């Protein structure tokens, strides 16, 4: 059977509560950190159902000023064991892996990293917290970050709009 013959079908019941996230979202945000100058960025975020009990997550961002690539993330959003619970597993090209746990309830998805992995040359991130507010075809979000030398502080804020389902 070829890839073209595979039918994704309907979302399984276990992930139906994640349906409001499905699609490709594009927007802009503002970033900063004590160790860097503030910056404005564009972003493309995709939550895609690939036929199983999870969603695939893909993110890429770029500087609005000149289009320079900034960041990429790839991973999976899965249901947890309790109603509304979610688990996010991500790989970052900065030499990091992230496992976050949280909830998606009434359009609010809040996640806290419970495990961070790092390569020998990976960025010294020790904590991440993500907050998403889903309102129809718009998502507003915030990301807080802690490193070995900086406590948890706001790093990114942005807003994306669904451009395809």
Model-based region annotation:
Residues 1-54, 62-69, 136-137, 146-165:
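Amphipathic/hydrophobic helical signal segments and adjacent flexible N-terminal regions
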Residues 27, 55-59, 84-90, 109-113, ...:
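Short hydrophobic/aromatic-rich beta-strand segments that constitute the beta-sheet cores
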Residues 38-40, 68-70, 94-95, 123-125:
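Short solvent-exposed loop/turn micro-motifs enriched in small/polar/acidic residues
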Residues 42-48, 73-78, 99-103, 127-133, ...:
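Hydrophobic/aromatic beta-strand elements that line small-molecule binding cavities or substrate pockets
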Residues 48-53, 82-83, 104-107, 134-138:
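Short, solvent-exposed coil/turn segments at beta-strand boundaries
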Residues 60-62, 90-94, 114-119, 144-148:
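Secondary-structure transition/turn motif
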Residues 64-103:
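Helix-adjacent hinge/juxtasegments
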Residues 93-96, 104-106, 110-129:
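Acidic, glycine-rich flexible loop segments
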């Amino acid at each position: 059977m070829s890839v073209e013959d595979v039918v994704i079908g309907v979302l399984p019941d276990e992930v139906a509560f994640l349906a409001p996230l499905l699609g490709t979202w594009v927007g802009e945000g503002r970033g900063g950190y004590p160790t860097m100058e503030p910056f404005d960025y564009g972003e493309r975020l995709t939550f895609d159902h690939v036929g199983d009990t999870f969603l695939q997550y893909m993110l890429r961002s770029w500087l609005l000023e000149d289009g320079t690539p900034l960041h990429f993330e790839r991973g999976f959003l899965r249901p947890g064991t309790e109603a509304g619970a979610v688990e996010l597993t991500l790989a970052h090209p900065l030499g990091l892996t992230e496992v976050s746990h949280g909830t998606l309830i009434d359009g609010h998805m809040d996640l806290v990293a419970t495990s961070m992995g790092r390569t020998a040359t990976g960025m010294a991130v020790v904590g991440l917290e993500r907050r998403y507010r889903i309102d129809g075809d718009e998502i507003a979000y915030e990301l807080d970050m802690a490193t070995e030398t900086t406590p948890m502080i706001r790093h990114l804020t942005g807003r994306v709009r669904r451009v395809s389902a």
